[in-house]
Amino acid sequence: MFDNSTQVVGLMGYPLGHSMSPAMHNRAYKDLGINYVYLPLEIKPDFLKEGIEGLRAFNFRGVNVTIPYKEKVIPYLDEIDRLAGEIGAVNTIVNNGGKLKGYNTDALGFKKMLEDDCSFEIKGTKAVIIGAGGASRAVGAVLAREGASEIFLLNRTLKKAAKLVGIWNKTYPGIKTVALPLDEDKYLPVVKRCDVIIDTTPVGMAPGIKGGPVIAKEAITRDTLVVDLVYNPPETTLIKAGRQVGARTMNGFPMLIYQAAYAFKLWTGIKPELFIKPVREAISPDFFA
């Protein structure tokens, strides 16, 4: 039952048809007995500024931000957290009395997933990131902060990848970062010698599932950890390709839960562990690839 004291949070993006966040958050709020509700807020690009202003006008407690707005929301916020500023992308906004502050819990969620669900130690490893959007910024920051020796960024638009690599080279001067085109002849010898491949693109996401994996199966070895941040469907074409060669695989569902749990703490002040437990228990194990 909603009343005047109900705290409203939500997910801001476009489109939102694939998202499980509302069901996940509302399940946790119900189980924990807190007076919150989580709403999908599909906002077309021409109305992003008005959408942000609406958070103040309607006194929302905050929102998560997803594709395509993680970078675009920043100019409309009053303040951003240090990590979010370093990454250059925001996925969580907190409204404190009309003052909007941006955070990035994607980075925290990704780090926890690698450590807890993949048992993967980043330090000294060679990593491949596919895609140069907001999620790749968070992933790259985690890898660099935790001491990866080399990071290769693959993107269809090489110019966009090169721009992000330029930022990383300045922010993390001790880490070798290289931009490569999604051209099999160029990336194949590099990717085959890497320890982890992380796909941050929406390729293979429901409902628009089509085509093969974003990189050639020949680039994956049985010693590679293959991570696809897409979680619906649980087995993307990239995950399937990884399994076919005997590689370890992980989809993005644990990261989704963890980043949500950290956002939950920012909004409610409640420990993220209390969010994680009921959500994990309610989710089919099929989601954990």
UniProtKB/Swiss-Prot annotation:
Q: In which pathway does it act?
A: Metabolic intermediate biosynthesis; chorismate biosynthesis; chorismate from D-erythrose 4-phosphate and phosphoenolpyruvate: step 4/7
Q: Which residues act catalytically here? A: 70 (proton acceptor)
Q: From the record, what ranges are coiled-coil?
A: none
The record, for SUPFAM superfamilies, names:
Aminoacid dehydrogenase-like, N-terminal domain, NAD(P)-binding Rossmann-fold domains
Provide the residue positions that the database annotates as binding shikimate: 19-21, 66, 91, 106, 231
Q: What class of enzyme is it?
A: oxidoreductase
CDD domains in UniProt: NAD_bind_Shikimate_DH
- GO molecular-function term, one example from the UniProt record: shikimate 3-dehydrogenase (NADP+) activity
Please list the reactions this protein catalyses.
Answer: shikimate + NADP(+) = 3-dehydroshikimate + NADPH + H(+)
Q: Which InterPro entries match?
A: Aminoacid_DH-like_N_sf (IPR046346), NAD(P)-bd_dom_sf (IPR036291), SDH_C (IPR041121), Shikimate_DH (IPR011342), Shikimate_DH-bd_N (IPR013708), Shikimate_DH_fam (IPR022893), Shikm_DH/Glu-tRNA_Rdtase (IPR006151)
- Record function comment: Involved in the biosynthesis of the chorismate, which leads to the biosynthesis of aromatic amino acids. Catalyzes the reversible NADPH linked reduction of 3-dehydroshikimate (DHSA) to yield shikimate (SA).
Query: What quaternary arrangement does the UniProt entry report?
Result: Homodimer.
Q: Output this protein's name.
A: Shikimate dehydrogenase (NADP(+))
Question: Which organism does this record belong to?
Answer: Halothermothrix orenii (strain H 168 / OCM 544 / DSM 9562)
Lineage at the top is:
Bacteria, Bacillati, Bacillota, Clostridia, Halanaerobiales
